[in-house]
């Protein structure tokens, strides 16, 4: 029996071990599967995180792109505002222009009303189209809310947005080009209007000539034909402009069609996104439904299984409990009866107890082994805790068995008297109990499996909950991104609206330009009609041939009008057809959009399976974009390097400018040195006997003013030089900058005609700031610049010829008196400085002859007068003739008291005001031919400048005349004895003045110059001096030929040219009464002193011949 029990226990133990090994094997398989699932889960998590990072980067890039787009939109809006302001300014200017032509517009009001009605119709149609577009946009907005899968399509959207931006930039560039073309066309039209105004002026002149002279009818006809040809050309130009405008409209319509196509593509993409969004939502709902249904199924199945097992287990346990209780009761009765039998079995029980103890120890060892394994399993996974609980249950069961065995031991000790039959029964009962224990173990195992399944279900439930949370988070993110995309979409819609507004503005501008062109056409037609009417009125006196030609011209103009009207109507019809076609195109485009939307919906339903491939492609696109961004960064770096190089080049240019400024400072210092040398030279002249008085007076009157100039801080030489250079750099006109190179005797060749030295510019600028010239305008100062040589000796030897102001026929008598009184002194000083070997006795012997010649000169001498800053005005021939008549009608009145004493103080006050050294010379600036520097250089001998002009005596002999410069002019009064003609420029040494160089001027230091009268024949000006005293001129000529050695070479050729022309006093009167046309043109060329006498219209006017004769006789007697 003991062996059987041992064998049963061993079998049970083997079974338990096999079950444990199976359990461990199953747990290992579960752990391996768990590891595989965890590895897969980690991989999926990594992929998910990577996709999240990529999406974040793409979103950031997209936000940056949107911000850039917004900035560009702001800049575009600002540019549009500026353009609108420009358009408003242009419209204001157009309104001002149209106000001038208000009378002409009354005839075209009906046509304009029709055009406005058409425009209103077109605007109503456009409003209808816009309403339809708004409804379509609303539908699109409703559909756009359902878009999905934007993360996958963001790259495509960005690419398309960049393409749209490029196209917008291209459109802006084209719009700017169109505006430039329109502005150019406007400028052309303005030029055309200017030409029309000039034609009107010409017509007015022609009418006046027709009223005066009927002999010029043929010329008027020719002018009319020319104007007709010009009008034909203008009409052709207008037609060309209309053709170009039509071409531009075609280009704009093609571009609008392209934009519509691109909008359709964008709408198709939006539809596809919306379809994908719908599919995703449906897929999510399906997943949620599946998850819930599967979870519910699993739970229901598990619950049903558990309930069935629980019911069966409870039934079995209840049955066994009842059986066991009955058995125990029977056993207790039987144990009491069989105590005797139990005593016999004590030994056997002791042996069995010993065996059980050994088995218990083995079980303990196995329990320890299992505990170690359970600890390892607990460390690896929490699921092993369930197994430990099972083992603990088994332990509890074993302990309960032990307790039962102890109870049995007690019972056996009490029932030693039990019999062997009872022992057999007990053994049978023990076997039954073993069977129940096995069943209990099986139940425990089943319970553990159920617990494991429950835990697995819980784990799966947790995973599903986590997945649901993740899906919810993804859904939230997706919604956020969708909102961002909605915002972007709204921004794009705003852009499209802005583009439509710009289109409308452009169309409005186009219509306005068309209206303006039509108005201009009507204005030109009406202008032509007016001109034709005026010509008809003027040609009523002509023959029937002129009337026939007028009829022909009227028929031509009427045919042209009809053609213009027909063209205008055709153009209107074309515009209406274009608008109708555009509306049909828009409707067709909407239909196509709807069809494309349906097609793309079907396509996107099929494309859901290929989302993974799209993700991989998008990753590749991201890589390509990153490489592109890196390339762009490299390009930006290269551009920065290029900018740095340009910055270095600019720094080099700045260094060069600094070096130039230093050179200018050095030149300033050189100028100071030269000025000091000049002052030393003037001081050295004081020691001369003959010219000592002149130099002393010069020092007292002029050098003191120079010292005052030096003391002035505001008028320092460097500042004046810098200001002068700034004025030159700021772009003074070429006419004012043109200079004349004076010649110097024996002092080298003069400077080139078109250049100026820095010293010359500075000296001219300094000499302008005299006290008497503060009231002059800056235009006079710039037009009267000095050309001074680099050394003081050259400056002294420079010959300067004054330019008489235009419009002034005579000068004051007081000035002429003082010139006569100082002529002897000038002759003596110049003869001493010229280096001739005449003695003082010869000079005394020739004193009378010098005075006679000075008298002859004084009659015609015109000292230069400062030109006032007046605005020149062009005068017609009638005005000139009327002024000449008034001048001749006025009596010539001379005040003898003013000749003697009265006006001396007035002139001294004015002469004292001229404080600079060369300020006196700038007063009498003249025009000069720069082609004669060598001739003038041969005639300069003394310290001061001298000049020679041809004088013709009554007998026809050629005489040389010498210009003498006084050292100091005595104060005299000032009159404005004005001749209404232009005075010819006086040129030294007999050089002929060039009428084409009317802006070149030189400086005279106030010396007396004989009056010279322009006799313009074939465009050349010959200088003729009217003289009446033959003996005096002969004596002076002999004296001048004996006294001057260096002037013969240059004066002979000039005397030959001047000797051929003899002019009498009557020519002077003729020139005063009627000015030739050439002199009138020369007057209009621009003499700054032409309007000097406008403030002094009340002064007396003298006849030049009469004044010269009386003055000559009186001066001869006084000297």
Swiss-Prot record:
Positions of region (Disordered): 846-884, 903-974, 989-1015, 1046-1109
Task: Give the record's GO biological process terms.
Answer: nucleus organization
The places in or outside the cell where this protein is found are:
Nucleus matrix; Nucleus lamina
Q: Where is the signal peptide?
A: none
InterPro entries registered for this protein in UniProt: CRWN
Show the coiled coil region(s).
140-226, 328-488
Compositionally biased intervals (Basic residues): 859-876, 920-929
Q: Alphabetically list the UniProt keywords.
A: Coiled coil, Nucleus
UniProt key word Coiled coil: yes
Give the top-rank taxon of the lineage listed in the UniProt record for this protein: Eukaryota
Q: Which GO terms describe its cellular component?
A: nuclear lamina; nuclear matrix
Task: Cite the record's Polar residues compositional bias ranges.
Answer: 1075-1085
UniProt function note:
Architectural component of nuclear structure that plays different roles in controlling nuclear size and morphology.
Q: Which PANTHER family match?
A: PROTEIN CROWDED NUCLEI 1, PROTEIN CROWDED NUCLEI 4
State the family it belongs to: Belongs to the CRWN family.
Q: What is this protein called?
A: Nuclear matrix constituent protein 1
